[in-house]
Amino acid sequence: MSAPHFRVAEPSDAEALAAFMTRTFRETYSTDHFGICRPADVEHYIAAHFGPEIQRAELVDPALRTILAEVGGELAGYGQVRFGSESPVVPGSRPVEVARFYVDRPWHGRGVAAALMQQCLSAAGDADRIWLGVYEHNVRARAFYAKCGFVPVGRSTFRMGDDVQDDWIMAFNPT
């Protein structure tokens, strides 16, 4: 495997990114989600959050930075950081949220995710707290985030269509 290459996504990436987001989200929540998520809820969430126009708007939003991981010119994953995103359970005057983080299955366990997370943490700049939400039953993701230095600090709810799920809030102290 060649080493991953990282870059900040640009508006010209919107269509490819939207397709990648749709596919990886659908695979994660339709297949790996223990049969809990109804397909209609997954599709509703995808339509509301991952379309090309939505991505174009997000890619020019100064409060967001989307980092792409590419291997051999192929999109292998992405991470999105949201500046100034507060959580009631994460104290800090300069919080940054890792709002989205997905790596395509063929790249799981091959170092792409760890390197991408380092890029996200670096992109957080002078944040005094970095946080994320992760589905409580996604044991693999929770273990990965813990390995990266995130610790559970609370809980929140996540709505996907009509489905209300419990998420863990995990935080990273960059100092």
Annotated model-derived regions:
Residues 2-5:
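Extreme N-terminal starter segment of soluble prokaryotic enzymes
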Residues 8-12, 19-108, 114-123, 173-175:
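Acetyl-CoA-dependent GNAT
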Residues 12, 16, 139-140:
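Short alpha-helical
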Residues 74-76, 106, 110, 130, ...:
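Generic detector of intrinsically disordered, low-complexity, polar/charged segments
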Residues 15-18, 82, 133, 161-162:
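Glycine-centered flexibility motif
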Residues 92-99, 128-175:
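C-terminal "cap" of GNAT-fold acetyltransferases
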